[in-house]
Regions:
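Catalytic-core regions of core metabolic enzymes
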Residues: 1-281
Length: 281
């Protein structure tokens, strides 16, 4: 029986137990069927595709056991965007973005605020954010004034907001409340590193309380660094619907993926056949 990607997408789109659709794809097959189904179903359920073959060698490896030629990668990217599909590059990203979209609202823009108790992870997160298509949010004058009143004089005075190593759970909670009210921010990434004065469990508990005021307005992500030593705090955040990550750069990239998905969904429209016809399948 010949079953196309379009058939599967329509089937899973109608399945009430399926909340999101993740696809590993080596060839697109019937491009018209895929794009027609995806553009319809993506409006109600996220469709995430991991398609290897970006490099010439990987494309050749895929062709060796599928017997099909891979289409031009840039054309496939355009096709995925046109029909509201999000393409990721790693298996880990498939599951992380599905979880994130299920827990947090999509950002309205690409501007992220990073709140951290250590400068290094903030810098690494910034590189990852900008490298994946996001941008740091500008801190408004009101936001700066409120943070100046809350934090020691030698805080970073910029985004990422470095609370410094002695940040208490209450400092974290108040800083996040302030950051969430910043009109120029579309999302918040909270980073905690284990330091001598850090209480990762109580900090997570206070953030979970604050998040109730923010939920639904902009996405919140967290990176609780420290392995088993911060596990209790991570569990508290997970139960509060805040996705947690081992490393802050991964979290920053997930925010960018969320924004890309939002853009793709907003641009779903009638499929232009000349794009489909350029796909080799």
């Amino acid at each position: 029986m010949d079953v196309s990607w379009g058939d599967l997408i329509y089937y899973l789109g109608d399945d009430p137990n399926t909340k999101a659709i993740a696809i590993y794809m080596e060839t697109i097959g019937d491009a018209r069927s895929f794009m027609s189904a995806a553009s319809e179903v993506a409006m109600t359920k996220p469709i995430i595709v991991i398609k290897p073959g970006r490099t010439e060698q990987a494309a050749a490896a895929a062709a060796s056991h599928t017997g099909s030629l891979a289409g031009r990668d840039d054309v496939l990217d355009a096709a995925f965007r046109r029909c509201g599909v999000l393409r990721v590059n790693k298996i880990r990203e498939v599951f992380e973005i599905v979880e994130l979209l299920g827990k947090q609202p999509r950002p309205k823009g690409k501007y992220l605020t990073i709140v951290t108790n250590a400068g290094g992870p903030g810098v690494i997160s910034t590189d990852a954010l900008i490298g994946s298509g996001g941008q740091l949010a500008w801190l408004s004058e009101r936001t700066m004034q409120q943070l100046n009143q809350l934090l020691p004089p030698h805080w970073s005075h910029a985004n990422p907001i470095d609370l410094l190593g002695d940040a208490t759970p209450d400092t974290y909670a108040k800083a996040i409340e302030i950051a969430a009210e910043n009109e120029y921010s579309d999302g918040i990434l909270i980073v905690l590193t284990p330091q001598s004065m850090t209480d990762p469990t109580e900090t997570a508990r206070r953030i979970a309380e604050v998040s109730k005021k923010i939920m639904g307005t902009k996405p919140i992500l967290a990176s609780w660094m420290g392995g088993a030593g911060v596990l209790a705090g991570r569990n508290i955040l997970d139960q509060a619907g805040i996705p947690t990550y081992d490393y802050p750069d991964s979290a920053a990239e997930m925010f960018s993926f969320m924004f890309e998905y939002s853009v793709n969904i907003s641009q779903v429209r009638i499929i232009v056949l000349d794009i489909i016809d350029r796909i080799v399948f």
